[in-house]
Curated annotation (Swiss-Prot):
Pathway: One-carbon metabolism; tetrahydrofolate interconversion; Amino-acid biosynthesis; glycine biosynthesis; glycine from L-serine: step 1/1. Keywords: Amino-acid biosynthesis, Cytoplasm, One-carbon metabolism, Pyridoxal phosphate, Transferase. (6S)-5,6,7,8-tetrahydrofolate binds at L118, G122, H123, L124, E243, S351, P352, F353. This is Serine hydroxymethyltransferase. The record marks H226 as: Plays an important role in substrate specificity. Catalyzes the reversible interconversion of serine and glycine with tetrahydrofolate (THF) serving as the one-carbon carrier. This reaction serves as the major source of one-carbon groups required for the biosynthesis of purines, thymidylate, methionine, and other important biomolecules. Also exhibits THF-independent aldolase activity toward beta-hydroxyamino acids, producing glycine and aldehydes, via a retro-aldol mechanism. It comes from Thermotoga neapolitana (strain ATCC 49049 / DSM 4359 / NBRC 107923 / NS-E). The keyword Metal-binding does not apply.
């Protein structure tokens, strides 16, 4: 593998090998990351990358699209079947572009949209001032109840009645609880708004049937195809409304994108096929079991979990009682081979670049085959590292760093990722 890269560009070959080693021997706990199958990876690295295919299957602006049409048709049909939707657009290059397409299809610049505050668990594209969504549209943010740290639906309704948004967005990037889509739809209908659900984080759980399906309630649903879906990096839009589908298709192309990434779309098709298997369903069940187990074990060790736990693949740890910043915790853990990300918490007092919490997710470690027993050990290692931080920069005592790094590697060796599947590369 990569023998041609090695010959043509040794520097990039070195990057590939070192990143492969990092993934193979490190514990990946970033909630938005996962490990794609070799089938998905091979499809992304295929000759399909050579083909321009502006337009849609059967309606292209280029000739020679017979086989890429077939790939996109498979991706569309599988996405529709997987999520129970009448229409699917598989061309968005990312979740952010999927969200942008929906906004521009259903609203005009200057219209009001409503989404969850970033500091309460939302996403940049849900109206953050630094993002296109916050610059193009007037934004009203809702948040969580500071006592329960769960969505305050009464506040959502109150804000919706007051501001009459064109679009209400449900979903987030750091919200660990199941969202009541039915309640959101009732609020949207009451004020004449479109309900858009961004299920980027929990799409895999939905595909497996272990999480409520927003397609049943929302006017339109967006997602990424990586994260819990375990596919290539890309976006997806679903709807049951033919008029919305037409508007979305026109907004994606020619509105905000040109040529689709056919190698990625084909890899999405592979991902959707994998997600239809019983093995995938069992995997998603274990993802949630592992997240719940980790949250419970963290609580036993004195850590405060935002909202008290999780219903999904992720949870937030408030490090304020431990007098550790999220930035320091992230750096300390990374120095020992454990990757998480710093994250703001509800009622955050620090800058997002420092933050008071960390976000932990289990999709990637579960892909390796790890279960509850391993989650206990991982929590033990996390606690050991965080208890050994010596300064605000996240420096860890050398002897602790060496011990934890060794134990992390040993654990990863017991649950190999690509090591036994890739030939020609010394890992």
């Amino acid at each position: 593998m990569w023998e041609h890269v090695k010959k043509v560009d040794p520097e990039i070959y070195e990057v590939l090998v070192n990143e492969l080693r990092r993934q193979e021997y490190g514990l990946e706990l970033i909630a938005s990351e996962n490990f794609a199958s070799l089938a998905v990876i091979e499809t992304m690295g295929s000759v399909l990358t050579n083909k321009y295919a502006e337009g849609y299957p059967g309606r292209r602006y280029y000739g020679g699209c017979e086989w890429v049409d077939r790939a996109e048709e498979l991706a569309i049909e599988r996405a529709k079947k997987l999520f129970g939707a009448e229409f699917a657009n598989v061309q968005p290059h990312s979740g952010s572009q999927a969200n942008m397409a929906v906004y521009l299809a259903l609203a005009q610049p200057g219209d009001t949209i409503m989404g969850m505050s970033l500091s309460h668990g939302g996403h940049l594209t849900h109206g953050a001032p630094v993002n296109f969504s916050g610059r193009i549209f007037k934004v009203v943010h809702y948040g969580v109840n500071l006592e329960t740290e769960t969505i305050d639906y009464d506040e959502v309704r109150k804000l919706a009645l007051e501001h009459r948004p064109k679009i209400i967005v449900a979903g987030g990037s750091a919200y660990a609880r199941t969202i009541d889509f039915k309640r959101f739809r009732e609020i949207a209908d009451e004020v004449g708004a479109y309900l858009m659900v961004d299920m980027a984080h929990f799409a895999g759980l939905v595909a497996a049937g272990i999480h409520p399906n927003p397609v049943e309630y929302a006017h339109v649903v967006t997602s990424t195809t990586h994260k819990t879906l375990r596919g290539p990096r890309g976006g997806l839009i679903l709807t049951n409304d033919p008029e919305i589908a037409k508007a979305v298709d026109k907004t994606i192309f020619p509105g905000i994108q040109g040529g689709p990434l056919m190698h990625v779309i084909a890899a999405k098709a592979v991902c959707f096929k994998e997600a239809m298997s019983e093995e995938f369903r069992e995997y998603q069940k274990q993802v949630v079991k592992n997240a719940k187990k980790m949250a419970e074990e963290m609580k036993k060790r004195g850590y405060r979990i935002v909202s008290g736990g999780t219903d999904t693949h992720l949870f937030l740890v408030d490090l304020t009682p431990k007098d550790i910043t999220g930035k320091a915790a992230e750096k300390a853990l990374e120095s020992c081979g454990i990757t998480v990300n710093k994250n703001t918490i509800p009622n955050e007092k620090r800058s997002p670049f420092v933050a008071s919490g960390i976000r932990i997710g289990t999709p990637a470690v579960t892909t390796r085959g790890m279960k509850e027993k391993e989650m206990e050990e991982i929590v033990e290692l996390i606690d050991y590292v965080l208890s050994s931080i010596t300064d605000e920069k996240g420096t860890v005592r050398p002897e602790v760093r060496e011990e934890v790094t060794r134990r992390v590697r040993k654990l990863c060796e017991m649950f190999p990722l690509y090591r036994d599947k890739i030939e020609g590369v010394e890992i």
